[in-house]
Every structure is written in C-alpha cells, then in structure tokens.
Amino acid sequence: MDVVFALGGSVLMPKEGASTENIQNYAQAFKKLKEMGHRVSVVVGGGNTARQYISVAREFTNESFCDEIGILATRMNSMLLISALGKDAVKQVPENFKDAELILNMDKILVMGGTHPAHTTDAVSATLAEFIDADLLVIATNVDGVYTKDPRCNEDAVKLDKINTKELLEITGSNSMSAGSSGVVDPLASKIIDRAKLKTIVIKGIPEEILASISGNHNGTTITP
C-alpha cells in the first residue's frame, strides 16, 4: 500500500521539547510499515517549534515571511525524524514533489516538510498523496479524529467515526488559517482531499495508531470520497 502520513509537529515535538525516545518510537513505527511492504511518505509539521518562532517574528514582519519561518521549522523537524530512521531514509529533505518521488523510487521512507507559503503541511501531504496516487492519506494529529466542533474548547463536540469529503468541507470550510495555525484538517487540505477523492483517516498521532491505521483497526475518523 502507498501511504502518506501527515505527522503533526506537536506530536513529534511536544511542548516539553525534543525527546529521543519519542522520536525513536515514531521512527520504529514507520520502519515497521516499510518492512511490511508498504511505501511510506511522511510530511512533518512545524508544531510548537514553528509557533514559538512565528510568535516573535510576527512582531516585526508580515505573514508571508512568517510562513517561510514555519516552513524551515517543518524541515528541521523532518531532519530529526530522518536521523532516527537511519538507512531507511535519505539524509535530504526534498522541497518539491518531483524530488520527493525520486526518494520513494529509491525504496526509502520519504520525509519532507512544507513547500509553499500559506500551505500547511496537511495541504502538502494531501497534494503529495494526489501527486503520487497514494492509496491512503493518514493525518496524525493531537486530536483523535474529526469532531463537529473543536473538542479542545467545546465540551459538546461530537466525534465522527465516518464522514465523506463533502461533510469534511462543511466542517472545515469556515476555519481561517494564518502562519503557525493548527487544526485537525485545514480548509485547503480538505478541498484537495475532496478534489483528489482521497481515502483519508484522521487519528491521534501516537505510534500505535499509526500502525493500526493501515489495518483499519484505528480509533480515529475515516473520510471517504
């Protein structure tokens, strides 16, 4: 199976900072999927690293430049994961999809970050999945699925086990994004998922759920075309 993972920067690099054990656990999960015969791509978010830098930079500059800072943070996080993957990855963070595909064709795990200003890594992962004609897109975040509202600030939010892409658009369509923003699925990614008719799963970004997402035994939300 050809699978693209959108790995939230905040799950790889939590507020407490970098953890050797945490990064190693994610690397082992992706290595195991590769050993099982799957072709694995991982797009890593900027997370707290990006937000900390952007919050300071925003006092001095515009959103476009803040986007560039965020992209660099995603690539730093990508390099950490690449270092933990060892020989299963290439020590290079591609900046476009053609270079990314070359790495996949080398039978390596692809790890990359952001590509364009104003595009979140969710949108990058969805576009990559469309570009390589992936079988599955998995969005691994700090929330365990898609809810009717943001469960982090709405107690009446209801988790949805299965929705279609049109319903996803309705849920995410009213959200606005700025540099460093995070959401379960951002509006642009939702549009790409709908356009490309991508089978998508949203899970809590822990190694166990990453492995379970392939078999279908996950506890997240399945999004169908």
Curated annotation (Swiss-Prot):
Major place of residence: cytoplasm
GO MF assignments: ATP binding; UMP kinase activity
InterPro entries found in the cross-reference section: AceGlu_kinase-like_sf, Asp/Glu/Uridylate_kinase, Uridylate_kinase, Uridylate_kinase_arch/spir
Pathway where this protein functions: Pyrimidine metabolism; CTP biosynthesis via de novo pathway; UDP from UMP (UMPK route): step 1/1
Keywords: ATP-binding, Cytoplasm, Kinase, Nucleotide-binding, Pyrimidine biosynthesis, Transferase
PANTHER family: URIDYLATE KINASE, URIDYLATE KINASE PUMPKIN, CHLOROPLASTIC
Protein's recorded name: Uridylate kinase
Taxonomic source organism: Methanococcus maripaludis (strain C7 / ATCC BAA-1331)
